[in-house]
A protein has these predicted regions:
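Extended, charged alpha-beta segments that form solvent-exposed binding/catalytic grooves
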Residues: 1-189
């Protein structure tokens, strides 16, 4: 009986005080994203398992999925991230939207990860997607949105350090130093 009276490991209850804090957090995220011209979208929490197999063939995320076969005999998974969902949505209706597309979502995600302090198996995340503009200005806009979000929570330049880098440039540099294995390169970075 005690087991059914507790939330599952890695999941949590939101009592009114925690709910109020969560609503403040998500309300701030929405306000800032909208101030940058982003429009909110959402997708299903449950997706076909193949959507994640295609994106992460052999990747770590596949081992962290909450997946099962539903009553219709379909292999499905609770979404662990938003990128495959938004990609699927945009492919389905690509001609209906002018680029650049500036969308954001605030959604729950699920990963069956090893439990650690501060890492839950269900978590809420802000995603800001700027599609159809690969310019440095688009990258700068996303960084500005990030900074403004942190400022909205009271952080200042005394609290924030952003280091901009280019993984390809680092990989090229490491190759000149004799580091060609990707796993070694990631450790070096």
């Amino acid at each position: 009986m005690a087991g059914i009276m507790q939330s599952l490991p890695g999941f949590r209850d939101f009592f009114p005080a925690e709910c109020a804090r969560r609503n403040y957090l998500t309300g701030t995220w929405r306000r800032v994203a909208r101030s940058f011209g982003f429009r909110e979208y959402d997708g299903p929490t449950l997706e076909p398992l193949d959507l994640y197999r295609k994106k992460n063939s052999g990747g770590e995320i596949l081992g962290q999925l909450f997946s099962f076969t539903d009553k219709g005999e379909r292999e499905v998974a609770l979404r662990p991230e938003m990128t495959p969902t938004v990609a699927r949505m945009l492919i389905a209706k690509a001609r209906e939207y002018r680029k650049p597309i500036k969308w954001f979502s605030i959604a729950p995600f699920f990963r069956y990860e090893k439990q650690q302090s501060g890492r839950l198996r269900e978590f809420l995340q802000l995603n800001c997607d700027l599609v159809g503009d690969a310019s440095p200005a688009a990258d700068a806009e996303l960084l500005a949105l990030l900074i403004e979000t942190l400022r909205a929570f009271g952080l200042t330049s005394d609290h924030i350090v952003i280091r901009v880098s280019d993984r390809r440039a680092w990989m090229e540099f490491l190759a000149t130093q004799g580091v060609t294995d990707e796993a070694q390169a990631c450790e070096a970075l």
